[in-house]
Amino acid sequence: MSGSECLTLIGEYVMAQEIERKFLVDGDFRSEAFKAVRITQGYLSSVPERTVRVRVKDDKGYITVKGVGDESGVSRFEWEKEIPVDDARELLRICEPGVIDKTRYLVKVGTHTFEVDEFYGDNEGLTVAEVELSDENEAFDKPSWLGEEVTGDAKYYNSMLMKNPYKNWK
């Protein structure tokens, strides 16, 4: 496990420390993507101290708990477990209003893989890219399509996009 993954063992699951930076996308990245997957996700809880997310990613289901981020917004605790996809679909029915619908593209840049999310529905027109790092000061290549950094800006958190979608920002 990398430094960003191994932190605390809880039962048979690892509580990870997620270290990532987030950017707006300002240009065409699709020709560089090596994979695309449709994601639907909702939140059972979206309080600032922790979020509990349910996700359907292709034909797999997941439940994820994320803790509060550090002051910079770069790192926070995360625990994720794969669950049966039918269970995830059922849990989506009881999530808070504002289910997120997006396509995630994976784009290799240097030694890192960027996850580029293109949103639909109430968040249509918003595209963000995240890169996971092994520590907060790790250097990475920045592609030409990477725009303004929005790491730590809560309005770009998926849990906030369901409450205050992109269509309401204009």
Task: List each language-model region with its residue ranges.
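Phosphate-end processing signature that detects enzymes handling 5′-triphosphorylated RNA
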Residues: G3-K170
